[in-house]
């Protein structure tokens, strides 16, 4: 599971998911990418599920680039505990994803394989996604 090695502060505030992504909005490493169309927190488990689904589809060959990292801790209080008495314990880590963010990229496979693998990976995520191709515009950047 992906998680930070060490953090300056153990717990964070939730924050808000306003606006579009500030960066990571074009295919940089692979030939095809999976782009988020909605804002969401993507958990480390969801990222791993999508990665495993793509690896299994490719069998051998192909390279997967994970462009998001779960660096935000989220907390949860135990069941049947009254409100108050401080913030809960860290339950896991999430990646904050905004619309337009390229989350996964693939290279070294045919277009049909890439499209199908990214479609399967998209079903593992809690948001709407679309598949994009690296364009001449992207290569110019």
Swiss-Prot record:
The gene is rplP. The keyword rRNA-binding applies. This is Large ribosomal subunit protein uL16. InterPro entries: Ribosomal_uL16, Ribosomal_uL16_bact-type, Ribosomal_uL16_dom, Ribosomal_uL16_sf. It comes from the Bacteria. The keyword rRNA-binding applies. Belongs to the universal ribosomal protein uL16 family. One of its GO terms (cellular component) is cytosolic large ribosomal subunit. GO terms for biological process: translation. GO terms for molecular function: rRNA binding; structural constituent of ribosome; tRNA binding. Binds 23S rRNA and is also seen to make contacts with the A and possibly P site tRNAs. Keywords: Ribonucleoprotein, Ribosomal protein, RNA-binding, rRNA-binding, tRNA-binding. Part of the 50S ribosomal subunit.
């Amino acid at each position: 599971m992906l998680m930070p090695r060490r953090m300056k502060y153990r717990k964070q505030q939730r924050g808000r998911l306003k606006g579009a992504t500030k960066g990571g909005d074009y295919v940089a490493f692979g030939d095809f990418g999976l782009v988020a169309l909605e804002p969401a927190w993507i958990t480390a488990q969801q990222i791993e599920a999508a990665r495993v689904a793509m690896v299994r589809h490719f069998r051998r060959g192909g390279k997967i680039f994970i462009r998001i990292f779960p660096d935000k801790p989220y907390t949860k209080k135990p069941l049947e505990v009254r409100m108050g008495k401080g913030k809960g314990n860290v339950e896991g880590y999430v990646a904050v994803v905004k619309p337009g963010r390229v989350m996964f990229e693939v290279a070294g496979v045919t277009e049909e394989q890439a499209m199908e693998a990214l479609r399967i990976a998209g079903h593992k995520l809690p948001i709407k996604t679309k598949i994009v191709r690296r364009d001449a515009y992207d290569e110019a950047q």
